[in-house]
Structures are given as structure tokens and as C-alpha cells.
């Protein structure tokens, strides 16, 4: 069955959630109306996912809904913001009720998991693409910014890098693995990245700068360095790479995935040495799992990759949507 | 020349405007960070414009930039909100510098006119489409909502209806007119609608309910009636239609444009009789130009169109993106 845009909203996207007390108007008026609690900043991030660029043509509506929200949540995580509201603009070739049912079920599942309320949006017909704007609150003034890294800071990464790219490579049949269990694990890492929300909130009072790894470590760390006017020395031997990758792939392959492929949605952050104790407490309490991969230097030193105590030459290339 | 996404942002969309004092972070971090002034509500609206649906394939980048912002501003106008910030997600087949230069010039022109600051966004490659999220402030608590119309309220329309649809019909070569000057005037009405921002702000303390005419009077007034649980009697003889339309087109044609075609972006609002004096003051001060077209009744009476004192039968059909 096909629906028009008003039917799509009322059938699949309206009244699925309780209003929160700061949401004066949600879906169904010319705009949403919200109230920002005192002493809070509002973090706003927006991301478009286009078929064939950010997701494969054969992605299921369930996986698409999860990933589009997770990717946007990751931007809030990198600011240390608490997720609150979201708007969804969806453009799709036809209003297929089976597709919409599956999409909206998965969409509200992740929204409810992260206590996000849908407050508005738009539905259109056209080639499949999704734009989400996501809103988070930051109590006080300590947001995690890209531009606050300081010379001498230590650089850390949450989790592991490269598994998402391995999963994508398997999905695209560029890589093959006999072990179905491992295949499925890596594909899941690509399709269901976990936004590091609680880590980001915990890091607000520990880290100086942060970014999420969406375009690849080299490219994303590059943003921190550019905005902070710093350089960095990275020890390649310490890059967190899972045993699954080191056991099943060649070093060139997984290092390239870890450095140049994106979509891990781990956080890369810098902390001053005086905050190491605080970080260790958070690690001990299992709020955060992270690895030190190097340190911030001065801008004129640039970004250096060191492997087995030797500087190595690398090709700096993150994910670029226009190549 | 072609650019990658970071070059597009830094060359065409960054540092074109002064930061306002409530904008802690704009473009260039994982999210924007804003501070909402005390006693203000934040209005948020989002709209996607897709090639071939909301704009014709041969639209110029200049017209596209203007219209996408104007359409979003119109949603804020219908809430009585003061425009403040905007985010832009643009998907385009290639990063053509001539196109981008023209688009961004026109984009910042309308932004500056309405004191809107660009605080973030996203660029992608794919079939041309634009998603804007727009943010406005409402001092106090009096937003113009769709659901506040009361039985006995008078119904008004700002400006005239139908000219945008006439312009579209000319652009699509469904209609022909010999007079080039009139043709260009009507096409301009379609391409450059004026969002009724100052009218919306003035109406916050006068009107009960409001909506902007994006999908057609019948459809949009229908939203007020549905949300307010009311009916309405509309006198077709009073629908504001310009002399240009009545002189150059048949009555069936222009009435259909006025009732069923959208994109006039005028405001339809209801006021209680006790506020007529206040409205007349605003009309006298030239803050608002509007026409009374009928009144609100009870829900069981439904929506009735009256022409020459007779009820007429009409086909209720606004613009539906999925038909």
C-alpha cells in the first residue's frame, strides 16, 4: 500500500513517543518548539546519507534507520553532549508501507535507547536519501571542541579502528573470508556502529579536544591539528587494532583501514598529562575503554607517523564524497 | 574546477558572516553550539527540496538558493518566530565552482537580509537536493500554533493567492501569455516568494492560529481546522486574487490556483473578534496587508466554500509529493 506524506507522518512517525517536558510542540505544526533548560548550551549537528555513497543500495530499512541515527549521535558524542531531540527528512522513491514499517520500527528503537525525541521532519519522493538534524544539551560551558588540543597533550582512541572498513570491504565483495561468524561480526561493525555517547559525556571534564572518526584517523585527527594549530606524533604500533583483523588480514590492509577508512565512529581525543589520573579512574570504572596512540606537538612539526621507531611516509587521504 | 567537501565548505560557506553573540561554535566542529537567550523558545523547522518535485530541473543556482531559504523562513513566519540560525545540507551531482559561487552568493544575500547565521551543514554528491533546518526565537510563550483557532474567529489571508501557481504554470509551459512583463512578474512570484516574517511576529499578539500556504489554501486551512477541532465557512468572493490574474485568466483557472495550488507562502490566520482593532492598527501601520475570507465554525459543520451566497462543491486536494 502507498501513502501520501501526511499519512506517512501520522502512521509511521507521529505519537510514537512521550513528549518530554522541554518539548512544547513536536511534529504537526509549522515548526517544533523547544525550551532549553537554564545553563545549558544546545549542540546541533546535521548529516545527510545518500544511497550509493553512505550506504549500499541493498541496505535493509532496519540497518539504514539504525546507522543514520548512530552516525548523527556520534557527532554529539564528540562534543560531549547529551542527546535530546532529532528531526528526520526522508526522501524515498515510493512510499512503500513494508519498507516504512521496518524503517520506523528500527528508527524509534535507537531513538528510545538514547532518549532522543523526534520533533519534526519532512517526507519527499525522490532518490533515497536521509537528512537528520540532531540536538544535544551540554550543561555548563565545557564542550569538547576540535580546536582545544595543546602541545604536549596525549592522544587517545576509544575502542578499535578498521573493523568497519573491513566489514564494508566484505559487503562490497572486495575482500573474502571463509569464516562466516567473523564475516558477520565485521559486517555488523560496519552496519551498527556504537556512538560513544557516555564516553563523550565523561570526557567533557577530562579531555581538551575530541572528534569522532567518521572519515578516517588521519583525516579526522587532521581536523584537530588544523583547528588547534598543532602537530602530532602517532606511534603506529599502538593503534588499537583487534585480533580479528590482525589474525585474518595483511598488515598493509588493516593499517590502511585503520588510518584512512572511516566509519568506525570511535572518538579521538587529547588530554593534558595532569588529567591522566582522572582518565584512569574512568577507565577503571569501565566508563571508557581507550588507547594512547601518541602526543600533540607544535604546528611546524606537522603530523608524523612512527612505526618501529622510524618515521614512515603515508598518503593523507580521508573519505571524500566528491572523489 | 571541482572541489572536495572540505574545500567547498571553506571556499563557499565559511567565514562569510559575523558570529552573533549567542553562537558559541558555528561551522567547523562536530556540531554547532548555541546559547538560547532567557525567556525565549526555540522554533525549529526543516524542509527538503528535491529536483523535479520542488524545483524545476533548469532552475538557476541563484533562484534555488533564494527559494530554499524563503520556504523555510515561511515556516518560522507562521509561528511568529524571529529567524536566527540555519544549517544547509546540499547534495549535488558534482562540485561545480561556477554553480557553487552563484548559489552561495544568493544564499548569503537572503541570509543577511533576514539576519540568519549559517551554523553548520553537510555537502554530498548525488542527485540535486537541499535540506535546510532553520531556527528562530520566540520571546515569551506566545507562538502562533495551528491548533488554537476558536469557533467564531475570523479567517484572514496576507497578500494574494494563486500568482505563484500561475508562474509555475508559465514556467512549465502549461499556460501561455503574450505579455512578457506580466509573464516575468508571475514567474518571479513563483521563484521569489516573500516569507511573511514581520507579519508573523506582529501577529503573535493578535492572532489565535496561523499556518503558511505552502500546499494550497484548502489543504493548509485544513490543518488549522483539524488541529483546532473546528470547521470553517469561506466566502470565495473574498479570496484575495490580484487583478493580474483576474484580467488574464479564466475564473476556474485562477480559483483553482488560489485554492488548490501551493507555494504562495502567504499566512492564513484566525483572530478572535475582540482583536480586530489591534489588527486594524497593524494594517494602518502597514505592518500587514490582509483580507478576511471567512470565519471559524464548529467541527461538525466542516469546511464550506460559499460563492455568490451558495455553497459549492469542491475537490479537496493540496499538493501531495507522492502523487
Swiss-Prot record, chains A, B:
Entry-linked Pfam families: AIRS, AIRS_C
Entry GO MF terms = ATP binding; magnesium ion binding; thiamine-phosphate kinase activity
Q: Which residues bind Mg(2+) 3?
A: 30, 75, 212
A single GO BP term for this record reads:
thiamine biosynthetic process
Would I find Magnesium among this entry's keywords?
yes
This enzyme catalyses:
thiamine phosphate + ATP = thiamine diphosphate + ADP
| Listed EC numbers | 2.7.4.16
Pathway recorded for this protein: Cofactor biosynthesis; thiamine diphosphate biosynthesis; thiamine diphosphate from thiamine phosphate: step 1/1
Q: Which residues bind ATP?
A: 121-122, 146, 214
Sites binding substrate sit at 54, 263, 319
Question: Which keywords annotate this record?
Answer: ATP-binding, Kinase, Magnesium, Metal-binding, Nucleotide-binding, Thiamine biosynthesis, Transferase
Residues engaged in binding Mg(2+) 1 = 46-47, 122
Which residues does Mg(2+) 5 bind?
215
Q: Which residues bind Mg(2+) 2?
A: 47, 75
Q: Which residues take part in binding Mg(2+) 4?
A: 30, 45, 75
- State the remark under miscellaneous: Reaction mechanism of ThiL seems to utilize a direct, inline transfer of the gamma-phosphate of ATP to TMP rather than a phosphorylated enzyme intermediate.
What function is annotated for this protein? Answer: Catalyzes the ATP-dependent phosphorylation of thiamine-monophosphate (TMP) to form thiamine-pyrophosphate (TPP), the active form of vitamin B1.
Q: Which family does it belong to?
A: Belongs to the thiamine-monophosphate kinase family.
**NCBIfam families according to UniProt:** thiL
What's the protein name? Thiamine-monophosphate kinase
Organism of origin: Buchnera aphidicola subsp. Schizaphis graminum (strain Sg)
Amino acid at each position: 500500500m502507498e501513502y501520501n506524506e501526511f499519512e506517512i507522518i501520522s502512521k509511521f512517525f507521529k505519537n510514537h513517543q512521550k513528549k518530554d517536558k522541554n518539548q512544547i510542540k513536536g511534529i504537526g505544526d509549522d515548526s517544533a518548539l523547544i525550551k532549553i533548560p537554564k545553563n545549558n548550551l544546545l549542540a546541533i549537528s546535521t548529516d545527510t546519507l545518500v544511497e550509493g555513497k553512505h550506504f549500499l543500495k541493498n541496505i535493509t530499512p532496519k540497518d539504514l534507520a539504525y546507522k543514520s541515527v548512530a552516525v548523527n549521535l556520534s557527532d554529539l558524542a564528540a562534543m560531549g553532549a547529551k542527546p535530546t531531540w532529532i528531526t528526520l527528512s526522508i526522501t524515498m522513491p515510493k512510499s512503500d508501507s513494508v519498507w516504512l514499517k521496518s524503517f520506523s520500527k528500527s528508527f524509534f528503537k535507537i531513538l528510545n535507547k538514547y532518549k532522543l525525541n523526534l520533533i519534526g521532519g519532512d517526507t519527499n519522493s525522490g532518490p533515497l536519501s536521509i537528512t537528520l538534524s540532531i540536538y544535544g544539551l551540554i550543561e555548563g560551558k565545557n564542550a569538547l571542541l576540535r580546536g582545544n588540543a595543546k602541545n604536549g597533550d596525549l592522544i587517545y582512541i576509544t575502542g578499535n579502528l578498521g573493523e568497519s572498513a573491513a566489514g564494508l570491504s566484505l559487503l562490497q565483495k572486495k575482500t573474502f573470508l571463509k569464516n562466516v561468524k567473523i564475516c558477520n561480526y565485521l559486517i555488523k561493525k560496519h552496519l551498527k556502529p556504537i556512538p560513544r555517547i557516555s564516553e563523550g559525556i565523561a570526557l567533557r571534564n577530562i579531555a581538551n579536544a575530541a572528534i569522532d572518526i567518521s572519515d578516517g584517523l588521519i583525516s579526522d585527527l587532521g581536523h584537530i591539528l588544523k583547528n588547534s594549530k598543532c602537530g602530532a606524533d602517532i606511534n603506529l604500533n599502538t593503534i588499537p587494532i583487534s585480533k580479528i583483523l590482525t589474525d585474518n588480514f595483511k598488515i598493509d590492509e588493516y593499517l590502511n583501514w585503520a588510518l584512512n577508512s572511516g566509519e568506525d565512529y570511535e572518538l579521538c581525543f587529547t588530554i593534558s598529562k595532569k588529567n591522566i589520573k582522572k582518565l584512569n579512574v574512568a577507565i577503571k570504572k569501565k566508563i571508557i575503554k581507550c588507547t594512547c596512540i601518541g602526543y600533540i606537538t607544535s604546528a611546524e612539526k606537522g603530523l608524523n607517523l612512527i612505526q618501529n621507531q622510524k618515521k614512515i611516509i603515508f598518503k593523507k587521504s580521508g573519505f571524500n564524497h566528491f572523489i
